[in-house]
UniProtKB/Swiss-Prot annotation:
Protein EC: 4.2.1.11
Gene Ontology CC annotations of this record: cell surface; cytoskeleton; nucleus; phosphopyruvate hydratase complex; plasma membrane; vacuole
Swiss-Prot/TrEMBL keywords: Acetylation, Cell membrane, Cytoplasm, Cytoskeleton, Glycolysis, Isopeptide bond, Lyase, Magnesium, Membrane, Metal-binding, Nucleus, Phosphoprotein, Ubl conjugation, Vacuole
Catalytic residues in the record: E218 (proton donor), K356 (proton acceptor)
Pathway(s) served: Carbohydrate degradation; glycolysis; pyruvate from D-glyceraldehyde 3-phosphate: step 4/5
GO molecular function: magnesium ion binding; phosphopyruvate hydratase activity
Cofactor detail note: Binds 2 Mg(2+) ions per subunit. Mg(2+) is required for catalysis and for stabilizing the dimer. Unlike for mammalian and yeast enolases, Mg(2+) is dispensable to form an active closed conformation. Inhibited by high levels of Mg(2+).
SUPFAM superfamilies: Enolase C-terminal domain-like (SSF51604), Enolase N-terminal domain-like (SSF54826)
Name the record gives this protein: Enolase
Length: 446
């Protein structure tokens, strides 16, 4: 029996930062299937276009009524009557025909908006899973050509200290994460992470005062830390105090494009201070040396966005220097885009992809980006955005694609824990068929 789409309705809802985003209800004979899309704070210039209204009289210009209108008036009439199990056909129709906008890196979604297209793409996936009478993660595995008899539960990368564009402190690096690779299961990994998180909170309160334990957009703390060493020392202390030394490692998201000066090709590690300390302005080569020193001193297993999104040369230098032992993740560099992934492969610029579905704008393209990365023995980290919703799609996606790692914030704030809680449910439902990535999080079963 064909399960055709009978109705599509889009609406404007609020994300976790209080900004509007797109939610879609898609109806078939089996029911209503809902999806909501996230948005990022530090976005790469090569990401697919997130369509905003720019009407300053509503939501300070951040409304998404244009994207809603595009769904209800342009996309919906074309999709009604189509079979919800035709994921690739529907995604291609939206991306290539109904939108059709392109740039040098591929389909840009600048006409209809990646937020409009992705919301429908996710809802179609949920409807397709129901039509096939399987869970969403099993259906996504089928779409990706993965075997569905053995699923991999990811290591959670929990963002517990915030800096950069996510915080009001002086810290230039954006995220410091704890990575419980030594746990025997996802359930235990989450427990390790939560215990380290609460221990860290106590350490911060003791050292910086109670005000320093307020949480940021992703649930992490933003104490008045001045540099990366101070943040890393705090994490090492918290991990040790919680009893998980050796079992919980550290990851960083530097988001270096946020403090890169393209005119003189330098990185300002004091970019949040009006009269910055000139000794903290570094060349790319100096930054390479800084990362190498940090990796020697601390149990760092992953560094994301260590350089600007166009600084291919220093990416390649760092990957050559420490890539064997440390995951070098290209976020703003790659923006989940297969064309940019191909360029990075040619240049040996990095060795891991952060998979953010809203950077590319459709589930079909996101799966393609993941498979291309895995085929070339890269790590793949499925990732949230700083502006999230209660939608848990990425939890099913990470299990389906067997990437072995997920980044979706601290074990705090409901829009973050919603994803972790969904992973607990999936692990429980899989029983003995669940494999936890653990120490092998970089290269999982493909």
């Amino acid at each position: 029996m064909a399960h055709v789409i009978t109705r599509i309705n889009a609406r404007e809802i609020l994300d976790s930062r209080g900004n509007p985003t797109v939610e879609v209800d898609l109806e078939t004979n089996l029911g209503i299937f809902r999806a909501a899309v996230p948005s990022g704070a530090s976005t790469g210039i090569y990401e697919a276009l997130e369509l905003r209204d720019n009407d300053k009289s509503r939501y300070l210009g951040k409304g998404v009524q244009k994207a809603i209108k595009n769904i209800n008036e342009i996309i919906a009439p074309k999709l009604i009557g189509m079979n919800c199990t035709e994921q690739k056909k529907i995604d291609n129709l939206m991306v290539e025909e109904l939108d059709g906008s392109k740039n040098e890196w591929g389909w840009s979604k600048s006409k209809l908006g990646a937020n409009a297209i992705l919301a429908i793409s996710m809802a179609v996936c949920r409807a397709g899973a129901a039509a096939n009478k399987v869970s969403l993660y099993k259906y996504l595995a089928q779409l990706a050509g993965k075997k569905s008899d053995q699923m991999v539960l990811p290591v959670p990368c929990l963002n517990v200290i915030n800096g950069g564009s996510h915080a009001g402190n002086k810290l230039s690096f954006q995220e410091f994460m704890i990575v419980p690779v030594g746990a025997p299961s996802f359930k235990e990994a989450l427990r390790y992470g939560a215990e380290v998180y609460h221990t860290l909170k106590s350490e911060i309160k003791k050292k910086y005062g109670i005000d320093a334990t307020n949480v940021g957009d992703e649930g992490g703390f933003a104490p008045n830390i001045l540099n990366a060493n101070e943040a890393l020392d705090l994490l090492v202390t918290a991990i040790k105090s919680a009893g998980y030394e050796g079992k919980v490692k550290i990851a960083m998201d530097v988001a270096a494009s946020e403090f890169y000066n393209s005119e003189n090709k330098t990185y300002d590690l004091d970019f949040k201070t009006p009269n910055n300390d000139k000794s903290l302005v570094k060349t790319g080569a100096q930054l390479v040396d800084l990362y190498i020193d940090l990796v020697k001193k601390y149990p760092i297993v992953s560094i994301e966005d260590p350089f600007d999104q166009d600084d291919w040369e220093n990416y390649a230098k760092l990957t050559a220097a420490i890539g064997k032992d440390v995951q070098i993740v290209g976020d703003d560099l790659l923006v989940t885009n297969p064309t940019r992934i191909t360029k990075a492969l040619e240049k040996n610029a990095c060795n891991a992809l952060p998979l953010k579905v809203n950077q590319i704008g459709s589930i079909t393209e996101a799966i393609e980006a993941c498979l291309l990365s895995q085929k070339n023995n890269w790590g793949v980290m499925v990732s949230h955005r700083s502006g999230e919703t209660e939608d848990v799609f990425i939890a099913d996606l990470v299990v389906a694609l067997r990437t072995g790692q997920i980044k979706t914030g601290a074990p705090c704030r409901s829009e973050r824990n919603a994803k972790y809680n969904q992973l607990l449910r999936i692990e429980e439902s899989l029983g003995n068929n669940a494999v936890f990535a653990g120490e092998k999080f970089r290269l999982q079963l493909n």
